[in-house]
Amino acid sequence: MVVTSVVEKRLGALPVAAEFLRRLDVAGIVDEVCPGGASAYLTHGQVIEALVVNRLTSPAPLVRVGDWARTWAVEEVFGIEPALLNDDRLARALDAIAPELDRIAGTVGARAIAEFGIDVSRLHWDMTSMSVHGAFPAGDQDEQYPVIGYGHPKDRRVDLKQVQAGLAVSADGGIPVHARVFDGGAAEVSQVVGAMKDLQGMAGAREFLMVADSKPVSYTNVTALLAAGVDFIAPVPAAQVKDELYAALDLAQAQAVDWVPERDAGKPATERESYRVLEDTHTMAGRRKRDPVHRVRRILVHSTAVAAGQRRAREKRLARAREEMDRLAGAAGGRHYGTHQKITVRIGVIAAKRYVTSCLRWTITGGEGEPCALQWHFDQDVLAAEAAADGWWALLTSIPAEQAGPDQILVHYKGQGTVERRYHDFKGPLAVAPVFVQHNRRVAALIQVICLALLVFSLIERQVRRALGAEQTMIGLYPDNRRVRPTGRMIFYHLGELTLRIGNTTDPPTVQITRGVQLHLLDLLGTDITRTRWPQT
């Protein structure tokens, strides 16, 4: 009997990630920006690439990255011994890149644009927050780096401190070409000008359109954008446009927009969300008399889905308020609500809780020896005025009318969902939270590393879709073989099943491919899975 030693390791998407990291030259850029990190074994750039690949394949705390490297074919693909990826070495690499995060992000982003031919004529900017577990006392944090503190968390965990990140995502493939880490308490409205300057530096001579949420809509930000010659699109904060303006609009005069949301593509025309647009001018004045007055285009948008949602929400609020007011009317004059004051206080609570203050009318009779009674109703004129404003919202833009009509402005803005989807990937497959590191400089560095992983993740998704042609769909991703657009999550899921069978010196390693979709994805990506990250010596 012959006994042979065979070892199997997870191969997954390691060869694919290695190819994209090679084209981006992440290790080379890190080593150029942060020289002096070379040891007898690894450079800072190699360590950072290992962290990027860990996030792409099987995110783990720093102390467990070495264990991940042992079970995955990291040594075979990247030439890195697992024992070298201990938490001390990883922490030193994070400390080394922390002072140069913006420079690394900008250089890698510019490299991605040039190497992969990314169209950056339209960039979508947004910020998100990551809650952090731990005390992180202010006195123990280095103020040269983003400070972890309390803010306005997206996950509503106001009991936890946070750190924030901003992404600029291209309309072409949803590629996060620029990323930056911010203080946990930084106001989003104050970061717009800095983001614009970063994007200008990265884009160089290229002109680009900056699409964002409502944060750019301040006099200071609009002034800076106009002065820099950067066109923008952003929604107007709801408080800046009165419902009376919307209620006075004639929907019949609005222009229909030839655009259908992707989620409605397979629905009958009568069930799809539809949009109509009108246009006027929005005036913005500074606080000082000498400040110039800005007049920019305002696109008034009506959405049938938004209108239906607002109508349902109002009906729900009214129904609950009606139930509680009827109950109060029945209890008026009794032991708990025997006085005008008690009834009035309760009405105030109901009106505030159900958001019906503007339309609720009531009369209290009795008192002074007579039992109190309550009569109430909803003001139908107020409700009709609210209903007339349903579905309307507004966008501001500096794009000249001759370059884009109001319908085109709306279509451009609708791409904002791309950056939101990337944040979903950021917090989902790449597991940005929880962050198990000490010191705010390491937190910032690790988040920037995860942003690099998101860049590779997005480029792989874009490559597969582009290789599929105009339809950008394929079969084999789901058990029922329905035709769908591949997402990064699907791609990494299927490639994650690849294994590497390692024999003895006379038996070369063998890649175990178990499903046809794996071969199809590798073919679409044009990846040679036998090629290692670094030349063999």
Predicted regions and their residues:
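Anion-binding and metal-coordination hotspots
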Residues: 1-18, 24-537
